[in-house]
């Protein structure tokens, strides 16, 4: 499975739940010579921001939102992604890496119940 396919599955699930969320531009960049990428980066887009940002507090307000970095197969978070995850976790958000739709659903349930 490709990361974009995983993201599409998760977006479909999130739309069904009615949660407030958005996806970042992580996968749109095509190379260093791409003029669109250079223009976006000149507008202060940050490398490493998680793929899915969910703007829903956990049930007892332990967390203000859930930020999910998607990885498939043997892929691992980059240095910048790890830094963003650490910064978000230090600021009352829950940021986590996810590798499958099944894992995502488990994460959502644990997030809502504040068991993660």
Regions of interest found by a model, annotated:
Residues 1-116:
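Catalytic phosphate/metal-binding cores of nucleic-acid and nucleotide-processing enzymes, i.e., regions
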